[in-house]
Amino acid sequence: MKNRMTVERKSERELVVTRVFDAPAHIVFEAWTKPELLRRWWVPKSSGLSLLSCEADARVGGKYRLVFGSGASKPMEFYGRYVEVTPHSRLVWTNEEGDHGEAVTTVTFDEIGGKTLLVMHDLYPSKEALDDVIAGMEGGMRETLDQLDELAVTLGANPGRHPAGATPDAP
């Protein structure tokens, strides 16, 4: 059975997503911070999109850039910088691609009994910015986080293979 995800709009500008993963926090954290692992779960498979480029320098001041595309369509980009990186427990980054100003995402990874409670808190610069993002995002987010859970379980089942050394799938 899939782990339950909750999505809650906390205010006009805040969105909180929670999800439990069937893997320890260090594995889930690595999957969020290593480009070779991000490539394996970040894009919902049903979207028909491919991750064309994936850069993540997960350190304070480091930058990330994810570029998605499909065929002849114009690629979409998500990019920003890491504001806080506490290994295996917390990530904070900016989202600088929006037309409404900069959003900030905080993700916490709390390990409980070998599983990870992930809480993702997005703070948008305006109500309009969150309105633009929230429509239709829950299904894609659910699929993406299910893919992350599958990857984390696979990585956890191979304890001799550190997540950072995992071989990425062909893009």
Regions found by a protein language model. Give the residues of each.
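Hydrophobic/aromatic beta-strand elements that line small-molecule binding cavities or substrate pockets
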Residues: 19, 53-56, 78-84, 95, ...
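Beta-strand/loop substructures that line and gate deep hydrophobic ligand-binding cavities in soluble
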Residues: 14, 92-143
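Hydrophobic ligand-binding cavity/cleft-lining segments
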Residues: 1-48, 171
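Short beta-edge strand/loop motif at the mouth of beta-sheet-based domains
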Residues: 16-17, 36-75, 161-170
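A conserved amphipathic terminal alpha-helix motif
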Residues: 123-171
